[in-house]
Curated annotation (Swiss-Prot):
Heterotetramer with CBR4; contains two molecules of HSD17B8 and CBR4. Changing K173A: Abolishes NADH-dependent reductase activity with acetoacetyl-CoA. Strongly reduced NADH-dependent reductase activity with 9,10-phenanthrene quinone. This is (3R)-3-hydroxyacyl-CoA dehydrogenase. SMART domains: PKS_KR. Substrate binds at S156. The fatty acyl-CoA dehydrogenase activity is several thousand times higher than the estradiol and testosterone 17beta-hydroxysteroid dehydrogenase conversion. InterPro entries: NAD(P)-bd_dom_sf, Sc_DH/Rdtase_CS, SDR_fam. It comes from Homo sapiens. Its EC number is 1.1.1.n12, 1.1.1.62, 1.1.1.239.
Length: 261
């Protein structure tokens, strides 16, 4: 079984945004571990390069045998940057990515009564607009090349149930769910599957800013009794990226340990 997983994505080229840390890095490691070539993208180029180093490159003794991963830098909230990212990936690997995972995301928390328009706009721009731009550019590349693919967008359970102090984040992640379902309806005839993943409270750099007393309270609400790890999300992404999920599209998979059932 282990050897099968190591080769499950052996022919895949995977573009992962937000690959410099947290869920994005864990997804990159998991996909590479299953044989995929990874194009790791982050706003922080050095962080993306560090992820690629962890994957192992040509001639490296670490990582999967195929190796040839590459790092890219892009601000996915800008249309031109998103288009250029896909062009750069295609130029580097001579084909469009068959797996696209949008993990890039930010928070700017504040209560609704005090939230600034700027904080609203920043979160919507990265989390929702950025996911739209990458999804659109990837779909255009796949369709124009006559290729099948799997697009996986990282949403959040907060997009389904809301959360105090996160009106902008909740709205952005709810939008990702709707975007992904609509994309699935439109792109299915092209052989492109689109699914979203809804993490719960996952131990990442983003959640490390949460006060410990809040973490303890949330942990008490999780039936599984503990926070999730980025690898828990990566496990689901790898399944959705593979042909093991070949008849699954338009779905939203919750990775929450049972939080907010």
């Amino acid at each position: 079984m282990a050897s099968q997983l190591q080769n499950r994505l052996r022919s895949a080229l995977a573009l992962v945004t937000g690959a410099g840390s947290g869920i994005g890095r864990a997804v990159s490691v998991r996909l590479a571990g299953e044989g995929a070539t990874v194009a790791a993208c982050d706003l922080d180029r050095a962080a993306a390069q560090e992820t690629v180093r962890l994957l192992g490159g040509p001639g490296s003794k670490e990582g999967p045998p195929r190796g040839n991963h590459a790092a890219f830098q892009a601000d996915v909230s800008e249309a031109r940057a998103a288009r250029c990212l896909l062009e750069q990936v295609q130029a580097c690997f001579s084909r469009p990515p068959s797996v696209v995972v949008s993990c890039a995301g930010i928070t700017q928390d504040e209560f609704l009564l005090h939230m600034s328009e700027d904080d609203w706009d920043k979160v919507i721009a990265v989390n929702l607009k950025g996911t739209f731009l990458v999804t659109q550019a990837a779909a255009q590349a796949l369709v124009s090349n006559g290729c099948r693919g799997s697009i996986i967008n990282i949403s959040s359970i907060v997009g389904k149930v809301g959360n105090v102090g996160q009106t902008n984040y909740a709205a952005s992640k709810a939008g990702v769910i709707g975007l992904t379902q609509t994309a699935a309806r439109e792109l299915g005839r092209h052989g492109i599957r689109c699914n979203s993943v809804l993490p719960g409270f996952i131990a990442t750099p983003m959640t490390q800013k949460v006060p410990q007393k809040v973490v303890d309270k949330i942990t008490e609400m999780i039936p599984m009794g503990h926070l999730g790890d980025p690898e828990d999300v990566a496990d689901v992404v790898a399944f959705l990226a593979s042909e093991d999920s070949g008849y699954i599209t338009g779905t939203s998979v919750e990775v929450t340990g049972g939080l907010f059932m």
